């Protein structure tokens, strides 16, 4: 495994879970964390520990979003009408880098952020290079013409390990996707259980 690949698995190793469902994740081979003390049996987590872990998993899944940025998303979710935990998932899934990842234009959420930042993506015909850009239902996301033959794109489309969720309509021949609607927790194909309700409890302390 290259240094670059190893770095991408550090979140899996830290949490002891394969949070993206990737076949090469090191936690597929062991059920303990890294380091010389990794094999020690983990004690029962406190309520705070469970809340913190839920936050770390959700942040990690979206590419280790910074605490400042993640809290900002939470605060917006809390201001909106409805269930805060469902709002939180909807806002995170509306990020442009998340949509690019879910559409299978690239293989990982980290690659999606870099892909967007490097200007390979148009939204409604205009280049957008901000991974946290908020997509709205009906937005059309397209890989720019010169980027459609990049190896990372061609390899990702053929990945069998994940499917495109039904709130995104993707045409891999044209490399175009439409963000159809804002999803809820039950709609998102998380590889492990996510508990946004515990994240809400963490920030509500």
Swiss-Prot record:
MF (Gene Ontology): rRNA binding; structural constituent of ribosome
Source species, domain of life: Bacteria
SMART domains attached to this UniProt entry: Ribosomal_S4, S4
Limits of the S4 RNA-binding domain: 94-157
InterPro entries in the record: Ribosomal_uS4 (IPR022801), Ribosomal_uS4_bac-type (IPR005709), Ribosomal_uS4_CS (IPR018079), Ribosomal_uS4_N (IPR001912), S4_RNA-bd (IPR002942), S4_RNA-bd_sf (IPR036986)
Keyword rRNA-binding: yes
Region (Disordered): 17-46
Keywords: Ribonucleoprotein, Ribosomal protein, RNA-binding, rRNA-binding
Pfam families assigned: Ribosomal_S4, S4
Cellular component, GO, one term: small ribosomal subunit
GO BP: ribosomal small subunit biogenesis; translation
Biological role: One of the primary rRNA binding proteins, it binds directly to 16S rRNA where it nucleates assembly of the body of the 30S subunit. With S5 and S12 plays an important role in translational accuracy.
Subunit structure of this chain's protein: Part of the 30S ribosomal subunit. Contacts protein S5. The interaction surface between S4 and S5 is involved in control of translational fidelity.
HAMAP family tied to this protein: Ribosomal_uS4_B
PANTHER family per the UniProt record, alphabetical: 30S 40S RIBOSOMAL PROTEIN (PTHR11831), SMALL RIBOSOMAL SUBUNIT PROTEIN US4M (PTHR11831:SF4)
Family: Belongs to the universal ribosomal protein uS4 family.
Protein name: Small ribosomal subunit protein uS4
């Amino acid at each position: 495994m290259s240094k670059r690949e190893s770095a991408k698995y550090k979140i899996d190793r830290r949490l002891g879970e394969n949070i993206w469902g990737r076949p090469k994740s090191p936690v597929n081979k062991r059920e303990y964390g890294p380091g010389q003390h990794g094999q020690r049996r983990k004690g029962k987590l406190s309520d705070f520990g469970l809340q913190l872990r839920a936050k770390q998993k959700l942040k990690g899944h979206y590419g280790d979003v910074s605490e400042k940025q993640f809290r900002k998303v939470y605060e917006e979710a809390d201001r909106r009408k409805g269930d805060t935990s469902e709002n939180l998932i909807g806002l995170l899934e509306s990020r442009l880098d998340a949509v690019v990842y879910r559409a299978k234009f690239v293989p990982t959420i980290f690659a999606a952020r870099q892909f967007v930042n490097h200007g390979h993506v148009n939204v409604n015909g205009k280049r957008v290079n901000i991974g946290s850009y908020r997509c709205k239902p009906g937005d059309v996301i397209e890989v720019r013409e010169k980027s459609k033959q990049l190896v990372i794109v061609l390899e990702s489309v053929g990945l069998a390990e994940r499917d495109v969720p039904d709130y995104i309509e993707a045409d891999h021949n044209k490399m175009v996707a439409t963000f159809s609607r804002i999803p809820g927790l039950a709609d998102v194909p998380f590889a492990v259980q996510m508990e946004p309700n515990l994240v809400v409890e963490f920030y509500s302390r």
